[in-house]
Amino acid sequence: MMRLFDYHRSSAAYRVRIALNLKGIAYESIPVNLLEGEQKEEEYRSRNPQGLVPMLEVDGRRLTQSLAIIDYLESVAPEPPLLPRDPADRAQVLALALTVTCDIHPLNNLRVLKYLSGPLELDQAAPSIAARN
């Protein structure tokens, strides 16, 4: 059975849970509490050196990054399809997904926000300012 290491408030992990459930794939959810720093503990880092969620374990292999995991799920369980079959339509969907994961998500990511307000000593308005530019 697949094992999904995730955090309930992680939008990246949520994307993978949606894909797994839409495809009807059974999986075991292994919570990783990001607020308590469980992703930084040796036990988790030994499995996933990135220390991020989600991570999907399948037959001893560890997959990371939500869009890569979703692409894997689409390949091994093509029905029902999550992505259009037409290459141009598929490219448009991927462009939208990449906009969310690369442009929007980082500005709302807890790890990024802590870094901005911690080591960089930026105020809480910094993400809003960055989003407008």
Briefly describe each language-model feature range.
Residues 127-133:
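Amphipathic alpha-helical packing segments from all-alpha helical-bundle domains
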Residues 1-127:
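GST-like domain detector, emphasizing the conserved glutathione-binding G-site
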